[in-house]
Amino acid sequence: MFYAALIALTSVLDLALKSGVESQPDTSYPKEVKGTGGIVQVRKLHNEGFPMGIMKEKPELVRCLPLAVASSLLLRLSCLLPKKGNHLEKAGLACMIGGACSNLFDRFFRGYVVDYLYIDKKPVSRVIFNLGDVFIAAGTLLAGLSGLLRAVAGRKKR
């Protein structure tokens, strides 16, 4: 139940932020995030492709490939849920699925993903992203760390 709630929370949080960004006129952006000295900004970008607009001329692929990946992540989580342990991997998968669901909602219902976070520091200053992307990245790190820890634990048993 915890992992289902994590999926819902991550997805709904990002969708709520996207809705707030969408409700404001384009002319109200960019906005500085207070306390960051202008380094973190809220912007408004409609991304019809993969990150950085890649493949925007292939909308079917841009919708279907992330759907296939999210489905495989959901299948993996479904296989892990009945098993004890693997909490780090389960949490990572839930974060990835939640972020993916938010972006998939955008792709299928808006026709584009709403990106709104900008950090004016290299190397990330080339990208505008959203909280769903952050959850996907964090989930990837958690799942990867889980695999690394299992590998280290397996070597110690030898």
How would you name each of these model-derived features?
Residues 1-158:
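Alpha-helical transmembrane bundles and membrane-interface segments of multipass inner-membrane proteins
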